[in-house]
C-alpha cells in the first residue's frame, strides 16, 4: 500500500501552518511513485548527492522535500520559500540550481535533521 509519511520534523512544520494552508498544500501534493519518472519541471526538482536522491515539490509559497521509499514517499521538510531563499542567499547559491544545492553540506544537514526524527 502506497503511503505518504511525514517524519516528526516535517509533521511539526506542517502543523505550524494554518489549517486552510495545510489542506491547500496537501491538495496540491497529489503524487504517485510513477509520477517521479516523469517530473513536471514547473513543480518538481531533483537534488542528488552520493547516490541519494531527494525531490522538491513547489506548492504555492512552500517547498516540500521528500524521498521515495519502499512504503511510498517520506516527507523530510516543509519550508516556506523565503526561509529557503534566505538559506540559499547565505550559501551564496543561485536560487534555481538544484545541482549546486545538492553539493552543499548545509542543505543536507537540514534534510538529515528531518530524517533523524521519528515518523509521525
Positions of PLM-derived features:
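A generic structural signal for beta-strand entry/edge sites
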Residues: 1, 52-54, 70-72
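Short, intrinsically disordered, mixed-charge
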Residues: 19, 30-34, 80
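A short, surface-exposed loop/turn module that caps and links secondary-structure elements
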Residues: 31-58, 110
Amino acid at each position: 500500500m502506497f503511503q505518504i509519511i511525514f517524519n516528526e520534523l516535517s509533521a511539526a512544520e506542517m502543523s505550524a501552518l494554518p489549517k486552510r494552508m495545510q489542506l491547500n498544500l496537501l491538495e496540491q501534493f497529489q503524487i504517485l511513485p510513477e509520477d517521479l519518472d516523469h517530473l513536471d519541471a514547473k513543480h518538481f526538482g531533483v537534488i542528488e548527492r552520493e547516490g541519494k536522491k531527494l525531490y522538491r515539490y513547489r506548492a504555492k509559497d512552500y517547498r516540500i522535500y521528500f524521498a521515495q521509499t519502499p512504503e511510498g514517499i517520506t516527507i523530510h521538510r516543509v519550508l516556506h520559500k523565503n526561509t529557503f531563499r534566505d538559506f540559499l542567499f547565505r550559501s551564496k547559491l543561485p536560487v534555481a540550481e538544484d545541482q549546486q544545492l545538492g553539493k552543499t553540506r548545509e542543505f543536507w544537514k537540514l534534510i538529515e535533521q528531518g530524517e533523524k526524527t521519528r515518523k509521525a
